């Protein structure tokens, strides 16, 4: 991994205030982003921009992964659900933060991306990440309830199933909207959901029974 490039990117994110938590900084430093993108794109791996990974999907910009990890308030030992595996990069970063005592379940609907991300995550030794082929808008009841849930595609709203599979005290982070999208944070407290608008974003559409 080109250390100088990633140090430069992370330093820029810190100076802009995108990331502050040491756990997030360490995770972004540890995950080799170039392993999660097509070889033809490797020279762009540490440019802070979304990149195409095939099948009409993208790997999120480094700053967006960092922001989402910060806003999720991740911690060691948490049980986390990701809706939309894509390349597997985001799941790897979260895996680094929750550690061996935590677990990341990530759902991908596109078979080609499912196979590729599963292979890369396995080769890199992310044993606490389980990649599932399916409709992420339904959640994944088998490993519920979750302490944290995040969605990497924008839907018309957050599927009810995700709230049902969230632990009390848990957080959901999801982009909501079609052309104009807002990253929303939801927290479940004593069975009630409290929501907060964070920032304007641009994600691929959330496809599924409870998406677009």
Swiss-Prot record:
Domain of life per record: Archaea
GO molecular function: protein-L-isoaspartate (D-aspartate) O-methyltransferase activity
Reaction(s) the record says it catalyses: [protein]-L-isoaspartate + S-adenosyl-L-methionine = [protein]-L-isoaspartate alpha-methyl ester + S-adenosyl-L-homocysteine
Residue numbers annotated as active site: 60
Keyword Zinc annotated: no
EC number: 2.1.1.77
Subcellular localization, as worded in the UniProt entry: Cytoplasm
Gene Ontology terms: cellular component: cytoplasm
CDD domains, alphabetized: AdoMet_MTases (cd02440)
Entry keyword set: Cytoplasm, Methyltransferase, S-adenosyl-L-methionine, Transferase
Keyword S-adenosyl-L-methionine assigned: yes
Major subcellular location class: cytoplasm
EC top class, as a word: transferase
Gene3D superfamilies reported for this sequence: Vaccinia Virus protein VP39
Biological process per Gene Ontology, one example term: protein repair
NCBIfam families: pimt (TIGR00080), PRK00312.1 (NF001453), PRK13942.1 (NF010549)
Function: Catalyzes the methyl esterification of L-isoaspartyl residues in peptides and proteins that result from spontaneous decomposition of normal L-aspartyl and L-asparaginyl residues. It plays a role in the repair and/or degradation of damaged proteins.
Family: Belongs to the methyltransferase superfamily. L-isoaspartyl/D-aspartyl protein methyltransferase family.
Protein name: Protein-L-isoaspartate O-methyltransferase
Organism, scientific name: Methanococcus maripaludis (strain C5 / ATCC BAA-1333)
Gene name as annotated: pcm
């Amino acid at each position: 991994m080109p250390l100088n490039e990633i140090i430069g990117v992370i330093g820029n994110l810190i100076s802009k205030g995108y990331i502050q938590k040491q756990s997030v900084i360490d995770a972004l430093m540890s995950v080799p982003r170039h392993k999660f993108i097509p070889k033809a794109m490797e020279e762009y791996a540490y440019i802070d921009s979304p990149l195409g990974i095939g099948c009409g999907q993208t790997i999120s910009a480094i700053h967006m992964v960092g922001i989402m990890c910060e806003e999720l308030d991740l911690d060691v030992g948490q049980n986390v659900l990701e809706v939309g595996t894509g390349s597997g990069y985001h799941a790897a970063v979260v895996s680094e933060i929750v550690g061996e005592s935590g677990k990341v379940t990530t759902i991908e609907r596109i078979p080609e991306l499912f196979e590729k991300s599963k292979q890369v995550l396995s080769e890199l030794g992310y044993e606490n990440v389980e990649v599932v082929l399916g409709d992420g808008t339904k959640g994944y009841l088998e490993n519920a309830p979750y302490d944290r849930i995040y969605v990497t595609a924008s839907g018309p709203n957050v599927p009810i199933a995700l709230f049902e599979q969230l632990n009390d005290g848990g957080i959901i982070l999801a982009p909501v909207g079609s052309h104009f999208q807002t990253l929303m944070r939801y927290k479940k407290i004593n069975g009630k959901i409290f929501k907060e608008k964070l920032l304007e974003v641009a994600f691929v559409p959330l496809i599924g029974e409870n998406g677009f």
